Amino acid sequence: MLVLDNVTKAFKTGTFGGGTLPAVRGASFEIRPGEVTALIGESGSGKSTLGKMILRLTPVTSGTITFEGTDIATLKGKQLREYYRHVQGVFQDPFSSYNPVYRADRVFATIKHSYFPSVSAAEWRDRVDGSLESVGLNPVDVRNKFTHQLSGGQLQRILIARALLLDIKILVADEIISMIDASTRVDVLNLLSNLKARGLGVLFVTHDLSLGNYISERTIILRRGVVVEMGATQKVFDNPQHEYTRMLLTAVPQLHKKWEGELGAEVEAIGATSQDQDRGRPGRYSKSSLHPLVGMRGRKGRRAQAVATEREFAAGLLRTDTYLRTHEEVPPLVEIEEDHFVATSTGAG
């Protein structure tokens, strides 16, 4: 298990480094075997910085990250190499992980050189082929190809196949499906689900709440580098307590809901009423189930409600941001129910 305890990262700013910019403040959570943990937040909220600290690509300013009881900041030489045998990362832009001068499958050669120097070439080839097949790739299709000859989805899966050649226990997946097409996204998500079933712990970094809800057992919500809500995914999504979480969830498009025209337009839905949906029966959605504004009478009423809702969220967000700007200490997380924590002092309901 990988544990973050009060982890903070502050970058130096200014011409002579006289200022500091806190990217992550007091983050504490676990990545457990056989679970997907979704790390959700807007761009600039500190998600990727947390991933890079876990992978030792950027140092921790304060706090500790421990893997199987050992502080990873103390690892050097062979110990650090052994850490990377168990903890790997795949990033948003797969092309950045390859040298375009070489063929894409050269990433496997570096693994062999570092971890399996005594394995014969024939045996290593069999291992690589098996790993590629396990992520849905035909070795013949990708072997000896340069990066520009492969798709983003293929390159992502090659990186995952490389990780699987090691005794991997933790995978940091940083926005890994944001640059690939919809059908390939499904393949990668199914692959992550299979890895989870094999006991792998995954940190799924994303700004997409729908994907986080779809794939994860646990969810962490970040705002300005601070964990404002976290816990079991179903509890965070079904019973959001922090204003920021509520605002994010309200903005998430629903696949079974359709918006047509202005707020005043009549909207008809395909599917089932909420009652029929709960019973698993086909039917229709009522207008009020489509959108919180659609069931109201009159355009003025809907617009007034829209303005009121926006003001409510803006006020809550202002409370959160004001607290984070004016307080050096990290707002405490309070357990409001089993495995559901919220930073109450920054705008929780």
Where would I find each of the regions flagged by the language model?
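ABC ATPase NBD coupling module
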Residues: 15-18, 72-88, 114, 236-240
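The feature captures the beta-strand-to-loop junction immediately N-terminal to the Walker
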Residues: 40-42
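Short catalytic/signature loops enriched in Gly
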Residues: 233-349
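ABC ATPase "signature
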Residues: 227-231
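Conserved ABC transporter NBD signature motif
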Residues: 63-71
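A short, surface-exposed alpha-helical micro-motif characterized by mixed small hydrophobic
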Residues: 212-214
